[in-house]
A protein has these predicted regions:
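Glycine-rich Rossmann-fold phosphate-binding loop(s) that bind the pyrophosphate
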Residues: 27-30, 52
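Glycine-rich FAD pyrophosphate-binding loop
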Residues: 39-60
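Dinucleotide-binding Rossmann-like beta1-alpha1 core, especially the glycine-rich loop
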Residues: 64-146, 268, 298, 306-308
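Central helical "cap/lid" subdomain
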Residues: 210, 214-259
């Protein structure tokens, strides 16, 4: 039991009330962040967070903890840079050590096309607030002495974009710090409480049916990861979401400090070092949509082959454990946030492989939308209605792995 859990054990864990001003379904990072910001920024504390398992027990506790802002479209760069800056202040704001560590993230280019893409990424990042430059191979070698610039003779390192403020933070500490901050203000967090239906009157949501009984609400927000289409269907809403498994694995301790996060868009892979010195690696989503949390040996083989081409020192490491989460992917590889066509039903979803890095900004912006009834300018491009208006936020090149 960590210090968060020890302290939270002493909090009151009341039974669900019959009604709340706001009910948030999903007790992961996005749901807890919205509750935290409703309470701390807007004084709205008659809020319930419903979690069918335990706090952070879903994808918020399965991600690889990378924070970055080096996206490929202006709207995304602004949003994720804002979230990155909120992360930088979150330890001071919550009074909790979140193990936030600024490392920088390299996106390697292996071809002429890759060089053009990473140069363009650096330019658009700088134009919209993210600190990113393009680096030549010799500059990359200074940052990552372990890298093989020949790429094993198959994937030569031709350059990279470098997002200086790329970072990591401990996911469970982020989840529990937000939960603690919300609960201190009076928010109710109900673990082991599953949403089994949405209560409606006509086209207006009036509450949530749970396995512990009905709970009425002025506003219901879905912050579900994985089974969001099922919950949305209960509200009469069809979402353009497909859910795919995403695998990762971690090795034993590597004694030297491997400082940056290294990613390759061409190889669809990335690696960072944990606080314990382990090498943490991930790759692209599984192609077949599924809710399965099973991991496969083929993933280890395929990813290891790609990573060893760039970082041959890892051939002496051993795999300690492997796991799988699930990702809700939208057609344009961008999130879906804000109001829906169903009255009083808000949604934050489509976070794919990039949900952890968005937790502070997503919660802040969703809280503002709920508190004011207006869509904040920052998330207006990410409304669900963009698909009907044929205004996609296409950013597949930035969001395939992490």
């Amino acid at each position: 039991m960590n210090e968060f859990q020890e302290k939270l054990v002493n909090f009151a864990w009341p039974e669900p009330k019959k009604s709340y001003d706001v009910v948030i379904v999903g007790g992961g990072g996005h749901g807890l962040s919205a509750a935290y910001h409703l309470a701390t920024r807007h004084g709205i504390t008659n809020v319930a967070v419903l979690e069918r398992k335990y706090i952070g027990g879903g994808n918020s506790g399965r991600n690889t903890t990378i924070i970055r802002a080096n996206y490929g479209i202006p709207e995304a760069v602004r949003f994720y840079q804002h979230s990155l800056e909120l992360y930088q202040k979150l330890e001071e704001e919550t009074g909790r050590w979140l193990m936030h560590q600024e490392k920088g993230i390299l996106w390697i280019a292996h071809s002429e096309m890759g060089i053009k893409q990473q140069r363009a990424r650096a330019e658009i990042n700088r134009a919209f607030g993210a600190k990113t430059d393009f680096l030549e191979p010799e500059e990359i070698k200074k940052i990552v002495p372990e890298i093989d610039l020949t790429g094993g003779g198959k994937y030569p390192v031709r350059g990279a974009s470098y997002n200086y403020e790329g970072a990591t933070a401990r996911h469970d500490r982020v989840n529990w710090a937000l939960a603690e901050g919300a609960m201190k203000k009076g928010v109710h967090v109900h673990q082991r409480t599953a949403a089994t239906g949405i209560l409606k009157e006509g086209n207006r949501v009036i509450g949530v049916q749970t396995d512990k009984g009905p709970i009425h609400a002025g506003i219901v927000m879905s912050a579900v990861g994985g089974h969001v289409t099922t919950l949305a269907a209960m509200a009469g809403l069809r979402l353009p979401i497909r859910t795919h498994p995403l695998q990762a694995y971690v090795t034993n301790h590597y004694q030297r400090t491997f400082h940056p996060i290294v990613a390759s868009a061409d190889l669809l892979s990335y690696v960072s070092q944990t606080a314990r010195g382990e090498m943490l690696m991930g790759a692209e989503i599984d192609r077949q949509p599924s809710y399965s949390y099973r991991s496969g040996h083929h993933f280890i083989q395929s990813l290891s082959y790609r990573m060893l081409a760039m970082l041959p020192f890892m051939r002496n490491l051993r795999v300690l454990r492997q796991w799988t989460g699930v990702c809700d992917m939208s057609p344009d590889y961008s999130p879906i946030m804000g109001k829906t066509e169903v009255e009083n039903f808000y949604i934050t979803t489509g976070w794919g492989t990039w949900g952890f890095k968005a937790i502070p900004a997503s919660g802040e912006q969703m809280a503002e939308a709920i508190a004011t009834g207006e869509t904040p300018e920052m998330i207006a491009p990410f409304l669900l209605s963009r698909f009907k208006r044929d205004r996609p936020m296409a950013d597949r090149g930035s969001a395939g792995t992490h």
